[in-house]
Regions:
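Mobile "lid/hinge" segments at catalytic clefts and subdomain interfaces of large enzymes
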Residues: 17-71, 146-225
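Flexible, glycine-rich loop/tail regions that form catalytic "lids" or insertion modules at the edges
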Residues: 189, 193-368
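Conserved structured core elements
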Residues: 11-18, 28, 49-60, 74-78, ...
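Generic beta-strand/beta-sheet core signal
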Residues: 34-39, 83-87, 126-132, 148, ...
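Short acidic, glycine/serine/threonine-rich loops at helix termini
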Residues: 1-10, 37-51, 91-97, 135-142, ...
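Catalytic alpha/beta active-site cores
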Residues: 1-93, 112-116, 121-128, 162-166, ...
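Glycine-rich anion/phosphate-binding loop at the beta-strand->alpha-helix junction
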Residues: 56-59, 82-184
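Phosphate/diphosphate-binding loops
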Residues: 4-24, 102, 140-151, 180, ...
Length: 368
């Protein structure tokens, strides 16, 4: 939908997910096979409601793939996680978002798929409410400490770990400084051990305001989910371009709100000054990458690859790749054993992907 790291079209990609899920349930039953995430969707511009609806629609597609493969919902739903939804500075709305998400996922797993194990009805995620990296600013980066604390408070008030995330120098580039890491860690510790934000799981329960806001969030997200469902589900809504276009449109509309000062970002489009603090930070390492190593990285990697191809058994590689191609053309076959055989024979990732490209084709970007 938003990340752009996919190779194959949606349906072959779901086939690969199905094969992975079935194989892992048979051979690695305690492995968390899938981590559903709306974080990158919101970071790309989706609204809060789209984030929730699209994420749950994706989750529904994954659950359906497992059921269609003959798995019992109670055998695999408890092994699903959500790595994170998106976030924003609107603390009350993000608390309501998390409360609504828990309701909707539980109802989906129980009522649509008939689950009986309550573990499968829980949303398990390492990060609950947070501000998201798009809430941090390059201008006046120290303000991001205050922003992250707001996210940490929201997380603690919706039953999560009150992590003051991300570090304040997130917008300055990859690799956090020593100062930013310490401030982020200590802000989280202050929220937990001094402010005791995490002492109560759901302190807003029963509040007319919060319960109403949760209901409104749930109703809006459910309506969007139902719209996607009517299209045929998440896969169809990606294929017809609905979800990618909706994200792009929302991103454009938010940018217009920021530029028109309908939405405020302190130090960016309001409360600006002529005298700005010069923030210098001490990096964990002087350079993220050794410049000399970077200059020769491609050459060294090509040499390593040439050595691998020279020393491996060519017939074994060809046989493994041929087997993968045959089974890729059979939708009823599970590709995991073939993929494992390819790796054991020292087939390269490019060679494996090229075989699957020949069968599945490549995903084409949606025209926005």
């Amino acid at each position: 939908i938003a990340r752009g790291t996919y190779i194959y079209p949606p349906r072959p990609s779901m086939r690969l997910f199905r094969d992975t899920l079935v194989f892992c349930r048979q051979h690695l039953p305690k492995l968390n096979v899938n981590s559903i995430g709306g974080y990158h969707i919101r970071e790309a511009g989706a609204t809060r409601i789209q984030d929730l609806a699209f994420s749950l629609a994706n989750g529904c597609a994954y659950l359906q793939a497992g059921v269609d493969a003959g798995l019992d919902i109670d055998d695999f739903a408890p092994m699903f996680t959500f790595n994170a939804f998106g976030g924003s500075m609107e603390m009350y709305h993000e608390i309501a978002f998390q409360r609504a998400a828990r309701r909707m996922w539980a109802r989906l797993v129980k009522e649509r798929f008939g689950a009986k194990d309550p573990h499968g009805m829980m949303i398990r995620q390492p990060i609950t409410a947070h501000i998201g990296c798009t809430s941090t600013t390059l201008q006046r980066p120290l303000n991001n400490v205050a922003r992250a604390v707001v996210g940490g408070i929201a997380a603690g008030m919706c039953g999560g770990l009150p992590a003051a995330y991300p570090p304040f120098d997130e917008p300055l580039g990859l690799g956090h400084s020593l100062e930013a890491i310490q401030l982020q860690m200590d802000a989280t510790r202050i929220l937990i051990f001094e402010a005791k934000v995490a002492d109560v799981v759901d302190p807003w329960a029963g509040s007319y305001f919060m319960e109403s806001l949760t209901d409104e969030t749930e109703a809006a997200a459910q309506a969007e989910f139902d719209k996607i469902d009517a299209m045929g589900g998440a896969v169809a809504a990606i294929e017809n371009g609905y979800m990618p276009r909706a994200v792009a449109k929302s991103a454009y509309e938010r940018q217009k709100r920021i530029e028109s000062q309908e939405e405020f970002m302190v130090g960016v489009n309001c409360f600006n000054g002529d005298n700005e603090l010069d923030v210098s930070v001490q990096r964990v390492v002087e350079a993220l990458y050794d410049p000399q190593q970077m200059a020769t990285a491609e050459e060294r990697q090509l040499a390593t690859l040439a050595e691998l191809r020279r020393d491996r058994g060519g017939k074994a590689v060809a046989g493994a790749l041929a087997g993968l191609e045959v089974h890729a053309k059979d939708d009823g076959a599970n590709l995991m054993p073939d993929l494992i055989e390819c790796v054991k024979s020292d087939a390269t990732l490019q060679e494996i992907c090229d075989v699957l490209r020949g069968v599945f084709g490549e995903a084409e970007p949606v025209k926005i």
